[in-house]
């Protein structure tokens, strides 16, 4: 079966909540994700190959987008699905005319940093004490489309 990316549906919400709370230690609720789905600026996409492999959460506003979270389920990691999901997402954003893509990432998340750098993101600044535990965040940027 081939890899596909689709928008989330209500049946995916419990998995999103579980992952956000498990991987990011966020206090995310089902109601919060349902509210996100009704917000026209927030988009979730799921990567599927027979089963859900991971997802990405984005804010999209005019010609700018921000990645809020990118998750590959633990049992699906180290299979290049993070790259595939990011590539699918960048292609989708290019199709709809997004020019600027940003994200924040923990300096300690070396796997994510490696992925983002491989996909052409550049670190543009540091947000001091950004996370609840006092860890900084690297702000990363990628220009999309052609100039």
Predicted regions located by residue number:
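Conserved acetyl-CoA-binding loop-helix of GNAT-fold acetyltransferases
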Residues: 72, 78-91, 110, 114-118
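Short coil/turn segments at alpha/beta junctions that flank glycine-rich nucleotide-binding fingerprints
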Residues: 79, 96-99
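Beta-hairpin "wing" of winged helix-turn-helix
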Residues: 125-126
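C-terminal "cap" of GNAT-fold acetyltransferases
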Residues: 99, 106-110, 129-147
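Conserved active-site tyrosine of GNAT-family acetyltransferases
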Residues: 116-117, 121, 140
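Acetyl-CoA-dependent GNAT
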Residues: 3-75, 86-88, 92, 96, ...
